[in-house]
Amino acid sequence: DHDHGARWQPLSDAVASGACVSLHNDGSVSPPTPLLNVQTAATRRTRSGAVHDPEQRITLDQALRAHTINAARTLGRDHLVGSIAVGKLADFVGLSDDPYCVDPGELAQTISVLGTWLGGQRINLGTFLAAAGAQDPAPHQHLNETAHARHCC
């Protein structure tokens, strides 16, 4: 309901309090949609189009940091991941556009992931899924097709 949605993730209050705000997906119950998470945090607009408690929006920069360096800090791994710096693991994604040059309300619809790097090495999606033990790759085939259509991997 609307009242529950309005109280959902009071991110602005958390940032104002000095908390290390992080965003993530729980793979077992939600799809891995970091760009949509960032978009929602910056706009408070849900998939249905409703805007819940707009005063709890955070800036695009705060939302991006919440999904990168702050998430790594929450896990105690910010010395290894969460940002690109000498001595870190070089785990990152390449995006089709600069998120700071796109309307935050259109982030997930405008920007796509062009590739993923782990330890500085570009990952081939098919190889990764096979190595991860995907029993039936059919549910993931659209990812590979999208990757090839966008000259990825």
Placement of each model-derived feature along the sequence:
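Phosphate/diphosphate-binding loops
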Residues: 1-22
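Active-site microenvironment of metallo-dependent hydrolases
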Residues: 16-20, 27-153
